């Protein structure tokens, strides 16, 4: 028993010692882990502090670059501690405070354009000027971009171990672009592209390339005539396919029998080439051979078409420098597609002819007269001249009416047809007849049977009425007053089209009136009430309120002229020298005369 207890106690002691050693090791490892964690935490905090310090330094540099009088050496040193994002912030902040975005430039920004793109007529290119608007000149824009491209893109807190770049600054005298170029066309069209458009098919025939490739046949290799501008001494000739060469050989065998007739066509073409000169004698000498040849080849329509085509091509393109080149149908279609836009632009430029100033002036006055006549109503005349507007309008319009009547009588008397004996006999015959012919349609006569039945019915009704047996049916008549109608309310101002049109007219007049009233030292408030009341009497439609600014200026002049008596302002009277000079100067700028303005104002002096 004692022997058994001894080993057990020894084993317990060994286990206890092992457990104590494990606990001690665990404490040591935990202590080491805590030390590592604290060390890593300290390193992380140091890295964060370093990062924050470099960022703070970069922001401080950005603030310093917003000031004036920046030297080149300071700018080179600043490039080592900032990123391109920091530099773009410098450019934006300087433009906000109306300074040039380039730190070395001390100029102030002037009027900044609002548009995003600019078309350069010097280089024929389109530029995006979003960034260019932050600089005072193209040189500053290019110099800023040149310096920004050298700034490293790596973070500022890891540049201690890197080698700092040697910054270079753009020297004066080197102009830059107007902005970022917009690529409207990937590649310019060349003459070689017309004959070999294979590499362009991906851009223009992406959807239909498969169908065209499947349906391509020998017809694509058939050659058609096409005109290319300019001479082509070094132009590449279109490469012929083997099938087209075989066709050409076969066509030569078939057309050998027509060589004699084609020879006459060649002779005629040579004679036409001689007729290109402006000498009239040579032209007359060529007329007789042409007539003979036309009679010879009248039997062959194909040769006649060739002759006509050659004549048209020789005569039409003799003055211009063009070259007749044979290209395939596929190339011809590609040629048309390439130059479709240019042809449209040239066609629109040639069609826009300059209109004669007199014609433009007449059209302007005609349109304004029609507008003012449509605007004028009886309420307008009553507002201008009072209740007795009829007498005032008749006096002012009596003389032109008499002239028109006299002109009509003279025209009637001077009509040559009225003196013809045939017309006189017809007029006398019409006067002798008890009735005259009318232009109305004549109704067809009723049938005899219907008339007979109606007569018998009428006689029967008369006899029955006198005997007292006939009773008339009471006709139920409904008065128009008894008809019930649903009451309708007038439209409110926000939905009334007439009110909206009046508001539009007043807005247009308010835009042009300050420019007219300013030189006369009259405020808009002096005439606005009367002008508004006058506009409310007009008959406005959706068509007679659409005018150009120059037309609205003339309309405002006319309305000011007719409101002179109503307003009672002496500055608007014709006796005022200042008003007269102002009107004369304004009409000269509009290429009009006082008579033209008078012809517009007289519309409101005549009755409706």
Swiss-Prot record:
Its EC number is 3.1.3.16. The keyword Zinc-finger applies. The modification Phosphoserine is found at residues 9, 216, 432, 479. A zinc finger (RTR1-type) spans 77-160. GO terms for cellular component: cytoplasm; nucleus; transcription preinitiation complex. Keywords: Acetylation, Coiled coil, Cytoplasm, Hydrolase, Metal-binding, Nucleus, Phosphoprotein, Protein phosphatase, Transcription, Transcription regulation, Zinc, Zinc-finger. Residues 33-68 form a coiled coil. It comes from the Eukaryota. One of its GO terms (molecular function) is zinc ion binding. Residues 193-205 have a biased composition (Basic and acidic residues). It is an enzyme of class 3 (hydrolase). Zn(2+) binds at residues 100, 105, 136, 140. It catalyses: O-phospho-L-seryl-[protein] + H2O = L-seryl-[protein] + phosphate; O-phospho-L-threonyl-[protein] + H2O = L-threonyl-[protein] + phosphate. Residues 206-218 have a biased composition (Low complexity). The modification N-acetylalanine is found at residue 2. GO terms for biological process: PERK-mediated unfolded protein response; snRNA transcription. Associates with the RNA polymerase II complex. Interacts with transcribing RNA polymerase II phosphorylated on 'Ser-7' on CTD. Belongs to the RPAP2 family. This is Putative RNA polymerase II subunit B1 CTD phosphatase RPAP2. It comes from Bos taurus. The gene is RPAP2.
């Amino acid at each position: 028993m004692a022997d058994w207890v001894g080993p057990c106690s020894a084993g317990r002691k060994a286990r206890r010692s092992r457990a104590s050693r494990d606990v001690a090791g665990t404490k040591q490892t935990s202590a080491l882990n805590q030390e590592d964690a604290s060390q890593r935490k300290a390193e992380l905090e140091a890295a964060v502090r370093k990062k924050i310090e470099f960022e703070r330094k970069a922001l401080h540099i950005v603030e310093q670059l917003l000031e004036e009088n920046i030297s080149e050496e300071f700018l080179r040193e600043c490039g080592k501690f900032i990123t391109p994002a920091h530099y773009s912030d410098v450019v934006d902040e300087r433009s906000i405070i109306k300074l040039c975005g380039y730190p070395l430039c001390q100029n102030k920004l002037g009027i900044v354009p609002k548009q995003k793109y600019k078309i350069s007529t010097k280089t024929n290119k389109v530029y995006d000027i979003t960034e260019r608007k932050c600089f005072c000149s193209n040189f500053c824009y290019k110099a800023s971009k040149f310096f920004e491209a050298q700034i490293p893109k790596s973070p500022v807190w890891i540049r201690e171990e890197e080698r700092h770049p040697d910054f270079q600054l753009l020297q004066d005298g080197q102009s830059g672009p107007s902005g970022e170029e917009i690529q409207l066309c990937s590649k310019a069209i060349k003459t070689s592209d017309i004959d070999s458009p294979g590499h362009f098919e991906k851009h223009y025939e992406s959807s239909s390339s498969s169908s065209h490739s499947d349906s391509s046949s020998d017809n694509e290799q058939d050659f058609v005539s096409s005109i290319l501008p300019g001479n082509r001494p070094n132009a590449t000739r279109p490469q012929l396919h083997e099938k087209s060469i075989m066709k050409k050989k076969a066509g030569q065998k078939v057309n050998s029998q027509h060589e004699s007739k084609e020879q006459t066509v060649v002779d005629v073409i040579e004679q036409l080439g001689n007729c290109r000169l402006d000498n009239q004698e040579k032209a007359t000498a060529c007329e007789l051979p042409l007539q003979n040849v036309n009679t010879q080849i009248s039997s062959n329509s194909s040769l006649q078409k060739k002759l006509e085509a050659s004549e048209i091509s020789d005569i039409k393109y003799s003055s211009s420098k063009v070259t007749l080149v044979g290209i395939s149908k596929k190339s011809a279609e590609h040629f048309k597609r390439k130059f479709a836009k240019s042809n449209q632009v040239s066609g629109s430029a040639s069609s826009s002819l300059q209109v004669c100033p007199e014609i433009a002036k007449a059209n302007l006055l005609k349109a304004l007269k029609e507008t003012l006549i449509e605007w004028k109503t009886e309420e307008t005349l009553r507002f201008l001249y009072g209740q007795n507007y009829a007498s005032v309008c008749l006096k002012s319009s009596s003389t032109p009416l008499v002239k028109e009547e006299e002109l009509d009588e003279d025209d009637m008397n001077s009509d040559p047809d009225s003196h013809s004996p045939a017309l006189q006999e017809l007029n006398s015959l019409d006067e002798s007849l008890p009735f005259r012919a009318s232009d109305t349609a004549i109704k067809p006569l009723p049938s005899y049977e219907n008339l007979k039945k109606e007569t018998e019915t009428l006689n029967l009704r008369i006899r029955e009425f006198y005997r007292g047996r006939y009773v008339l049916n009471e006709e139920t008549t409904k008065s128009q007053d008894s008809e019930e109608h649903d009451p309708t309310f007038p439209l409110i101002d926000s939905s009334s089209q007439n009110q909206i049109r009046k508001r539009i007219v007043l807005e247009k007049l308010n835009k042009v009136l300050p420019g007219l009233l300013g030189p006369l030292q009259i405020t808009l408030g002096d005439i606005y009430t009367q002008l508004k009341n006058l506009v409310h009497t007009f008959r406005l439609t959706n068509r007679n309120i659409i005018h150009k600014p120059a037309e609205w200026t003339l309309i405002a002049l006319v309305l000011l002229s007719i409101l002179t008596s109503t307003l009672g302002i002496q500055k608007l009277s014709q006796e005022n020298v200042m008003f007269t000079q102002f009107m004369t100067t304004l009409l000269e700028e509009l290429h009009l005369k006082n008579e033209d303005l008078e012809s517009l104002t007289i519309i409101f002096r005549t009755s409706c």
